[in-house]
Amino acid sequence: MRPVYIDGCYGVLHDAGGRRGVVICGSLGDEALNAYRAQVFLGESLARAGFPALRISYYGTGDSAGEDDEPDRFRAWIDSIVAAVHWLRSTCGVTSVVLCGIRIGAALAARAASELEGVDELVLIAPVTSGRRFLREQILTARTVAEIWQSTGDIDDGRWFEAYGLRLDHPTRDALDKLDIGKLYLPVRRILMLEQPDSVGNDRLVSRLRDQGIDVVHEIAADSDRLLRDSHESEVPHASFERVAAWLGDAGELVQSDRDLGAGSLELDAIRETPVSLGPADTLAGVLTMPTGHEVESPVVLIPSTGANPRFGNARGTVALARWLAEQGIASLRMDGHGIGDSLPATGEHGVPYSKQGDRDVSAGVDFLAARFRGPVIVLGMCSGAYHAFQAALDDHRIDGLILLNLQKFVWHGGESLSVVQRTTFRTTGFYLRNAANPAVWRRLCRGQVNIGGIAGALASRAVRHVAAVADPAIAAVRGETCVGMVRRQLDELARRSVEMLYLLSGNDPGLDEISEYFGMRGWLLRRNPKVIFRTLTGADHTLSAHWARQRLQQMIAAYLRQRFDVASRVEPVVADRVGRRASRPRVLSVIVPQRSGAAQESVARTVIDSAPTAA
């Protein structure tokens, strides 16, 4: 896998020698996270079959340039696909290109194909054939998440459409709403459509496409729905991918694959981002974000994976945070753990949150930063990333600061399953107390829609653990160190080492009960620790997917850096809308960057790609 930048868009080339190439077009929003790892496998499987395959992150998504508030984002997505096709032809020497779209990426690929010459084949995997249907699905997801987390914020406030990490201005939303494969004229020769088992039939669409003279193979792919599960449960639909390779057939006559891939770094408003490889045998992938307009401040920040999500994070929050830190003069590394995102697996398995490997991955990230920077190292983690940051800090004395966001577990017991833990995790005690007098809750209870037995058991268990936490010194005197005592001792050890901690929990996050069980009601013992800044963020969901929540997080981090590391804020933490930034597309610089081929690495000098300014 080789990282590249194409007109400001981050891409990964799975190189091969065939004359027929494939551009893989992913989905948007939360679906882009969940299906990311599967797309890596798709690219690898196509390359093994001889097809050079290019995964592209659209402009304003993933690790690409661009922001939510820029105009013409829909047009930018289509331009990203068009640029990827031209790049694959010019760089890899392919004579024909297949567009392979996943979910709403299928409709975007079809739209791009309607404008391109020489794209005569389309592969549509679990396709959402219209933007309107996709937006409706996102609204349902957003409402479900808001109900679960009791989070606040409008899905549509008259200016912005925001649904669990997908944030669109109205012109972009309207353009996406009008997208419909059935209304496009497609100058392609043939199409493979692999639908989900429970999808609404697209027989009418298939008939329309065949009326255009297109050879359409329309099949139900039994395993394609695995793409839509949460990233830690998402599975690679191997049968579907094998079907794609079989349908494509021969990759064509082999050509030379020792090509110069071009760009290695991305420059954005005095910020430079460079894909890097690190860890044992360079098996871990990351992006180093550096300020270029002034000297690098200390400290530096490491941002490990959250769950099995790729490094750009839910709502692209990690990218925004890294670039904001660079505006403060602070370098950062966001990285994928083993078996997550673009990183290779450590044991041949998919990335497993809360495994010991995650602790080692954090230390590998610290190795990388410590070898390049002299300042203090801060590790910023969310959920399982916070757990691994905490665990790594206990053993790695090079870690000087921790930013722990919605930490769910201080202790992970061997044999526990994340899926089981999530299914058996109930809401905070405070949530149930606040809703005890809510008539709607009682109506749901009478209809049997509330798991009253499970809730009662969870509350009773919490009460017992709260009492045990208060009585921990007496229990420890008789039975030896308890789990509560161990965690308290660990926090004390970090404090004695002067590890500065910012501990943030969303207002209804189950982590509130976790902290109460170890440090008393709402963590009162933790609040007394002089090395800990403890904050809650009312109205935010678990992943801080809302734009306002991410802005508030920036404010809290700015205060933490100012108070604990004497870092002066160079810009306002809540960044004003910067409409029109796309008027000048980013320049991609020539640098030496790692190139991955299996586990082997080599450094290659890459040529300059200088994008011309584009009108907004």
Please state what every model-predicted region is.
Residues 3-6, 72, 116-241, 245, ...:
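The alpha/beta-hydrolase serine catalytic core
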Residues 16-57, 292-334:
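Short, surface-exposed "cap/lid" segments of acyl-processing enzymes
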Residues 232-269, 540-543, 547-596, 601-616:
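Catalytic active-site module of serine/aspartate enzymes centered on a nucleophile-bearing elbow/loop
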Residues 57-72, 335-352:
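Glycine-rich "HGGG/HGxG" loop immediately N-terminal to the catalytic nucleophile
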Residues 28, 52, 57-62, 128, ...:
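Short beta-to-alpha linker loops that shape the active-site pocket of alpha/beta-hydrolase fold enzymes
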Residues 70-90, 350-371:
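Alpha/beta-hydrolase active-site loop
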Residues 1-17, 250-296, 546:
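N-terminal cap/lid segment of alpha/beta-hydrolase-fold proteins
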Residues 100-109, 380-389:
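Gly/Ala-rich beta-loop-alpha elbow adjacent to hydrolase catalytic centers
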